[in-house]
Amino acid sequence: MVELPESLAGLPEPVAERVRVVASRRYPAAGTFVLHWMHTALRVEENPALDTARFLATRLNLPLLVYQGLSERYPYACDRHHAFILQGARETHRELAAAGIPSVFHLERPGHRGPHLRTLAGRAAAVVTEDFPTAPISDWLPRVAERAAGPVFAVDTACVVPMRLVGRAYDRAFSYRDATAAMRAARLARPWFTVARTQFASVAPVVANTAAPTASTSVSTPAPPPVPPSAPPSASPSAPPSAPPPAPPPSTAFDLPFEPLDWERIEEDRAGLARLIGDCDIDHTVGPIADTPGGSRAGYERWNAFRRSGLARYAYDRNDPLRAGTSRLSAYLRYGMVSPLRIAREAAAVMAAGGGGKAGAEKFLDELLVWRELAYTFCHYRRDHGTVAAIPGWAQRTLADHQADRRPALFDAESLARGCTGDPLWDAAQRSLRVRGELHNNVRMTWGKALVGWTPDLATAWRHLVDLNHQFALDGRDPSSYGGLLWCVGQFDRPFTPPQPVFGTVRTRPLKDHAMRLDPDQYREQVDRPAGGSAPRVAVIGAGVAGLIAARTLADSGFEVSVFEKSRGAGGRAATRRAEPKLAFDHGAQYFTAYDPRFRQAVETWIEQGLAARWPAPLVQIGPAGVAAKTDQPERFVFVPGMSAIGRHLAKDLSIRGDLRIARVESRPAGWELIDTAGQSQGQFDYAVVAVPSPQAADLLGDHPFAAEARAVPMTPCWAAMAAFERRVDTAWDGAFLHESPLAWVSRNSAKPGRDPSSDCWVLHATADWTAANLDLPKDEAARQLLAAFGHSVEQSAAAGQGGRCGASHSTPDGQAAPLPATIHLDAHRWMFSATPLTLDRQCLWDDASQLALCGDWLAGGRIEGAYRSGAAAAGCVLRKAGLATP
């Protein structure tokens, strides 16, 4: 056992045995407070890390500061995880204030970023935090320790048998159960002690820092008497002390390097929490869960209800999700909002009482204290737990031996995430993860095993297992999650013979067998049952990329969504015009780029599906100075076989009413009513998402304040000519940006990936100024003039040695020969709302009171990526409104 420093002498044994020394240093003379970094034990009751920090602050005669931060950069950061953590933090910091303990919360977002934890650690006399063995905490802790000025202690707050006492990782539950039996029994029989304020002195005032230790002296403050282990547990985590606690020092007393959240202000603003989450640069397409709010109160309410009515039957009902036989505590345990120590004690009391509840309590404790803590201990000692290296050698070998076996099917990441495999049981399970943020453990085992058979190799299966679980599950990224996922690929298990296809000797759990004991239709009905009785109705006006992303995100999240589109097709300016089978033109958006990591992830999935491809085209700039290669080229992508493919893809499975123009969106007491151009109502909806160009949005909204904001964002028109030639235009490039020309851009459409190269098809985009000056030209005349300008550009290119004459030529209106072959097709299309020189850079507009969202590329920097991000942001606003309960 690691010896603790003298400053922690007298720390009660139930706490002391949990402390791990991360960095052993002398206490710095300049340290002005003890810092408790709180992250995965969001509770005041039975919190060994908080108790250790309070004890140490008392010993050092220094104030205690509790710091909690929420980063935008943790893996799978999204509204769901952010909301759950913030809800729990709001309650915890309220209880800390009631206990007289100063606490601050830093929420990373634009204007509020920086390495503030490391800054505080560098000024603290000591740092105390929770010992949590999975990323990102396990990665961040060494960095914090490196920057800390004083010692750093990590305290196990998650396990009844502390991880550090187990000594090693176990790969079988029975081995772990036997090895820890004595330690577990001793701790279950020992009530948790009470941290009384008469024994842990109140926090010292900031100005009373007279006994701060120096670098060369030990702490001389006498230890407070330890609380006897047999002391009765606190009757209530928030019971008032015998004397009012002193007022905590203001946050300004700690010279904070950031502005902490003002919880009182957030409480006063009904939409404050949702707005803060919306400001964060995280995934807004995974929304909060309305019936699973964060916080100790909600967690213990769930536990008490289960203890009363479910615990006794747990052994019999736990494997059937239709019986609601589980505690559903995993998310609360994952973030330490409930104490596993208390849960275990109370379950053990039921078991000890005997009678009908004994079997259920005994099985529950086995899951809580053996399987769960087996996973925590495994992750603690196996730092490779997040990789396939953590899988037993026999499992790795047998899966490798069967890697070439024929798979029943292969699915891409998007189809899996959306639950679109065609297997009713698996799709219902994935929908439970996506919509409810949880998955019944017995179903999770079958769900996870299926991915082994649906992916080409172990590495891909593991990646999908981790991504799907951690993105959607509220209990994701914790040791229990890794334990369950590792079990799916052979860990904590033994070989099964004879070998099976794909799996080898890894245990199988066929979906068809599970469907015989769990009716997929009943399970899907349970998963889809709205928490409020009926699914919220959402109207999306506009089936461009922004509208489709918003609509599909909400439909996948359980909303009843109707899309209204004035055109016959979907996709907006991501459009493709076909003149005949071999002639196709992307006459709207030409290509797209991907800078945002979440959009980039979607693009990689589209590439995997064959829906998109990289376009490494040779591009040039043509102007008065000549022709120059475009050197500052980002990676460009196109949709396949045309840009309109994305509209068809996103529109699949959506209810779209096409060729229908909405004239007005009118506010009603219960939401919004849509009126078409014939004056007919198209229905009333709880939410409205307007996803059309800014001038059209302004017309739809009447006197709503957003109408003025939309009207302030102009959109420019664009003439687009489409030309096909009898022979190839002789250029060394496939696309060009033009300057001082009627044209802004030209591209060889037939050179894009997935296009028919047998015909030479070009798209010619006019400048906004030329289009505005020639807005009323007949389209045939606009096409002829733009073709002439193209010929002039090709002539410039030829003169610069970049290709040129192609044989036959045609005459321009001024009689000059143009170096172009004869056209076999020439047409034009006028885009009235093509682009905007000014965007609001707001992602979307949201009116919380009326439940109205505006989205579109005109709000988010333009282009397809901007439209995607704006649609996702609008969906996030609706998801947060529906998923965040009023405090």
Residue ranges and their predicted role:
Residues G791-A798, D814-S850:
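Flavin (FAD/FMN) cofactor-binding core of flavoprotein oxidoreductases
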Residues A555-E580:
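Glycine-rich FAD pyrophosphate-binding loop
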Residues G571, E580, F585, S681-F737:
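Central helical "cap/lid" subdomain
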Residues M1-A196, A208-P213, T217, P224, ...:
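Trp/Phe/Arg-rich N-terminal binding region typifying the photolyase-homology
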Residues G658-E673:
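A conserved short coil-to-beta-strand element within the FAD-binding core of flavoproteins
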Residues D320-L518:
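Active-site-proximal binding-pocket segments
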Residues M722-L775, E781, Q785-V794:
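Active-site substrate-recognition segment that forms the wall
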Residues A169-P213, P244-H380, D384-A389, Q522-E525:
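Glycine/tryptophan-enriched, flexible segments
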